[in-house]
Regions:
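Glycine-rich phosphate-binding loop signature in dinucleotide/nucleotide-binding domains
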Residues: 41-45
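Short, charged beta->alpha transition segments
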Residues: 31-40, 65-67
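N-terminal glycine-rich anion-binding loop in soluble enzyme alpha/beta folds
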Residues: 1-33
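Short coil/turn segments at secondary-structure boundaries
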Residues: 21-29, 51-58, 85-86
């Protein structure tokens, strides 16, 4: 069964299939797909395409190949592809900020420079209470996953500077994982506890965990209110690798660790 990442009804069916034991897989767009997509946009004007991070997928290479072919076809149009080095709602947050700049009338060159300067500063902090999909993807070993499940251990992960997933620790239970995520935000967010920038949270079929994470952030950061924090579903593509019960926190801060 084929699921589209942005189909809410399909997302519900997707998680239902996972609960029944289905093992989803993903595929990426080819160069021709990108050419068709980007060419339709070029008909309307110059294009700045912010691609999903190369640390997670090679699709940015296909986008760059398509862009090169289209630039040769029409050198009068400007088409730029940027490797965001971001993923999931961190990627969405970067694009959201770029769109804000565009809507304020900033030039394409200004937006491009801002994205390049800030993409490595969007922190991706996440954890999971279900280790089976991380075992399948090689993030944790089979033995570690079994022991972790027995001991109720949550792996703590983040994206590094290049946008690759790094498992840097573990904690026992969801409450401690939430506490660690907030502590990381406190240490790395712009202005520390005075942070007042954007904050996104996403989850894979665990809305209660997302709400608990949001409440912990609001308690720790007085300038952020519950309504300021955007909570999103993890789409089918990312959830094919994380499985259910993953929650993630995104915020702007210093450079992510290399």
């Amino acid at each position: 069964m084929l699921f589209r990442s942005r189909d809410p009804e399909g997302l519900t069916k997707f998680y239902a299939r996972i609960a029944q034991g289905a093992l989803p897989s993903t595929s990426q767009l080819n160069t021709y797909d990108y050419m068709s997509f980007l060419e339709s946009l070029l008909a309307q004007g110059d294009v700045l395409h912010i691609a999903f991070g190369s640390g997670m997928t090679k699709s940015v290479e296909r986008a760059q190949e398509a862009a090169q072919a289209l630039r040769e076809k029409d050198p009068n149009r400007r088409l730029v592809v940027i490797d965001s080095t971001c993923s999931s709602s961190g990627y969405g947050m970067l694009v959201d900020d770029a769109a804000d700049l565009r809507d304020r009338g900033e030039s394409m060159e200004t937006v491009e420079a801002w994205v390049l300067a800030h993409s490595h500063r969007i922190h991706h902090q996440f954890f999971s209470t279900d280790l089976s999909y991380y075992r399948r993807g090689g993030r944790v070993s089979g033995a570690a996953a079994t022991i972790g499940t027995i001991l109720n251990l949550c792996p703590l992960m983040h994206l590094n500077y290049d946008g690759r997933i790094i498992a840097y620790g573990k904690t026992r239970g969801q409450k401690n994982a939430i506490r660690e995520a907030v502590n990381v935000m406190r240490a790395h967010a712009e202005g520390g506890e005075s942070y007042q920038g954007k904050c996104f949270i996403c989850h894979s079929d665990c809305l209660g965990t997302a709400h608990a994470l949001r409440d912990a952030v609001v308690q720790a950061f007085p300038n952020l209110k519950a309504d300021d924090i955007r909570i999103c579903d993890i789409g089918t593509i990312i959830a094919s690798h994380t499985g259910p019960n993953t929650a993630a926190l995104f915020f702007m801060g210093d450079d992510r660790p290399r």
